[in-house]
């Protein structure tokens, strides 16, 4: 099975049972994909889980990712950060976040076409979003 990129919205959907794509996120998790994500995504997720009541679930999710043979977490690094900022500068016509730009670079470098995300910016960058809302 080919690798997919996991974005912040995928992890939030897994953690929040009331999320509109929670069921689809669970189904994708159970599908057995090899998952690629970045420490930038985990940083963004950690910020989204800032409420004390979310800490345990966030930490458990990260521990599970680190332990999973199906998951690869691309580390933070100055070169990747610089590449993301360069792409952001090149695409000032788009409302892409720095984390989005870094994700796109990782996906292109690894030949990944599919993203576990609800974020339309991935489609703007030429990728397929597997959790597109309203796709049921």
Residue ranges, per PLM feature:
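Short, well-structured N-terminal submotif of metal-dependent ribonuclease cores
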Residues: 1-37, 50-63, 133-136
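Short amphipathic alpha-helical interaction patches enriched in hydrophobic/aromatic residues
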Residues: 12, 49, 69-70, 88-92
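Short loop->beta-strand "edge-of-pocket" segments that line small-molecule binding or catalytic clefts
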Residues: 34-36, 69-72
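Short secondary-structure boundary segments
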Residues: 39-41, 100, 119-120
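Active-site neighborhoods of divalent-metal-dependent phosphate/nucleic-acid chemistry enzymes
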Residues: 72-114
């Amino acid at each position: 099975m080919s690798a997919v990129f996991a974005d912040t919205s995928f992890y939030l959907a897994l953690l929040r049972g009331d999320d509109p794509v929670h069921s689809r996120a669970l189904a994708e998790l159970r599908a057995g994909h090899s998952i690629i994500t970045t420490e930038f995504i985990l940083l963004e997720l950690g910020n989204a889980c800032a409420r004390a009541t979310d800490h345990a679930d966030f930490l458990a999710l990260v521990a599970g990712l680190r332990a999973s043979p199906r998951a690869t977490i691309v580390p933070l690094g100055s070169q990747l950060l610089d590449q993301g900022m360069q792409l952001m500068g090149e695409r000032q016509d788009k409302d892409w976040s720095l984390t989005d730009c870094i994700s796109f670079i990782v996906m292109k470098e690894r030949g990944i076409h599919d993203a576990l995300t609800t974020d339309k910016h991935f489609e703007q960058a030429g990728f397929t979003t597997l959790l597109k809302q309203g796709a049921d």
